[in-house]
Amino acid sequence: MKTFLVPLLTLLCVHTFAAEKTPLPTAHTTRNIEGWNVRVDDRLLSGDGAGAGERALKLLTARLVAITIVVPEQSLAKLRAISIELDLNYGDLRNMQYHPDAGWLKENGYSEQLAKCVHIPEVEDFLSPFENHRMPWVVLHELSHGYHDQVLGFDEPRITAAWKKFCDSGKYQSVLTSPGPMREHYGLTNPKEFFAEMTEAYFGSNDFYPFVTGELKQAEPETFALMAEIWGSLPARDKPKAAAKP
């Protein structure tokens, strides 16, 4: 009896796991939000998910508005060519991500239509108060992966060279993060994450030091100059208006 019990239990576990696996969305509605094509999971537009969908669309709109305000027009036009997909949930995927490879998607049972798109696979994670406080510019982070891939090329030598200097400096093995703990800088991972992290600090705020543009300019002046070269200059301070004559 024991020789048959283990396989039987294994089959039952596999069957239960398969039955509980989160389903993939079956239909989307495309909306234009601030110039981006956003494919919205229909489960977020009606039924039980409509409330979360409404909040997520408001949040995504706010994030995209912020990007349109600070990114120079020439670069912004190229960012807007990158589609975004917003889902209630999507299989085992949780974190927002950019999908560069249709082959990987196919191998893992996901839609190849996600290739070259920024994907928000779980609305609950997107609406997380902690994650929004920690990474308010994460949408730009993921869009910058698309820009790196589709506009510059992932083999862009200027970014690779800057990343190597960043790694070799030894300064980023343990840095302050926005929640407080010291951690290894995520930009050390590879040139792709380095570019996305530095882009967040250049235009907005990152969750690893250097957090904002002034700190980036002070700590990594060459990287700051590279961001300006690739993206364009930061917005200039508005000149004060002359007082009207009485």
Spans of model-derived segments:
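Sec-dependent N-terminal signal peptides
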Residues: 4-14
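Metalloprotease/metallohydrolase-associated module, dominated by Zn2+-dependent proteases
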Residues: 24, 102-125, 129, 163-246
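Acidic/His-rich structured neighborhood in mature extracellular/periplasmic domains
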Residues: 54-168, 224
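Short N-proximal segments of mature Sec-exported proteins
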Residues: 36, 139, 193-197
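Acidic/histidine-rich, surface-exposed loop or edge segments in extracytoplasmic proteins
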Residues: 30-54
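Boundary at the C-terminal end of the N-terminal hydrophobic targeting segment
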Residues: 16-20
